[in-house]
Amino acid sequence: MRKLALVPIQFYRYAISPLMASHCRFYPSCSCYAYEAIENHGLLRGGWLAVRRLGRCHPWNDGGFDPVPPAPSSRTSSIAE
């Protein structure tokens, strides 16, 4: 399911985005952010992170560097230490 959700993002990145002028206020771009978020966090959490990012992409936001948050580590590794 995750790979299926990434197909439209890849299509946008490689077929539509090059035809448009670069308008993204953030680094990485919103499409790269969405791809990485879904890849690292899964469809639900990654999709939610992507929607939140798109909500921040507007003229009143300065933008800048906004990386995908790291995936939560396993709780068992912190208990074992």
From Swiss-Prot:
Keywords: Cell inner membrane, Cell membrane, Membrane. One of its GO terms (cellular component) is plasma membrane. InterPro entries: Membr_insert_effic_factor_YidD (IPR002696). It comes from the Bacteria. Residues 61-81 are annotated as: Disordered. It is found in: Cell inner membrane. The keyword Mitochondrion does not apply. Belongs to the UPF0161 family. The lineage of its organism: Bacteria, Pseudomonadati, Pseudomonadota, Gammaproteobacteria, Pseudomonadales. This is Putative membrane protein insertion efficiency factor. Could be involved in insertion of integral membrane proteins into the membrane. It is a peripheral membrane protein. The keyword Glycoprotein does not apply. Transmembrane segments: none annotated. It comes from Pseudomonas entomophila (strain L48). NCBIfam families: membrane protein insertion efficiency factor YidD. SMART domains: Haemolytic (SM01234).
